[in-house]
UniProtKB/Swiss-Prot annotation:
Underlying gene: Nppa
GO molecular function annotations of the record: hormone activity; hormone receptor binding; neuropeptide hormone activity; neuropeptide receptor binding; signaling receptor binding
Protein name per the record: Natriuretic peptides A
Presence of the UniProt keyword Disulfide bond in the record: yes
The family this protein is said to belong to: Belongs to the natriuretic peptide family.
Length: 152
């Protein structure tokens, strides 16, 4: 019993004595105050040069841009959908001697192509969970965020 009380006393002594004398010492060397001040000055300088995202584009300007984009896309509904084929008259140069890229035909064709691209399955399904390639793999395997939306 005597050795047990001595061992117990020794461990109690170490438990109370060591925390006061042993501190956390980092493995790396300590950073001096001048280095910290230089780093802080550098960060302040960078913050002055880089504008905050909210200041760059106020929410009001963003809503105006989305309204303009919506108006531009709503005008696309007037154009018939692009089937992916070119008319024989466009291929041959037109019946009236017009080239295949007459401005009116060209704009209608481009608008219908744009609408087809925007309405395609890949442009409709966007995910913030994965990147594009991983998202497609996830959709095919049944894993991932958009697996319930689109199946091949």
């Amino acid at each position: 019993m005597g050795s047990f009380s001595i061992t117990k006393g020794f461990f109690l002594f170490l438990a109370f004595w060591l925390p006061g004398h042993i501190g956390a010492n980092p493995v790396y060397s300590a950073v001096s105050n001048t280095d910290l001040m230089d780093f802080k000055n550098l960060l302040d300088h960078l913050e002055e040069k880089m504008p905050v995202e909210d200041e760059v584009m106020p929410p009001q300007a963003l809503s105006e841009q989305t309204d303009e984009a919506g108006a531009a896309l709503s005008s696309l509904s007037e154009v018939p959908p692009w089937t992916g084929e070119v008319n024989p008259s466009q291929r041959d140069g037109g019946a009236l001697g017009r080239g295949p890229w007459d401005p009116s035909d060209r704009s209608a064709l481009l608008k219908s192509k744009l609408r087809a691209l925007l309405a395609g399955p890949r442009s409709l399904r966007r995910s913030s969970c994965f990147g594009g390639r991983i998202d497609r793999i996830g959709a095919q395997s049944g894993l991932g965020c958009n697996s319930f939306r689109y199946r091949r």
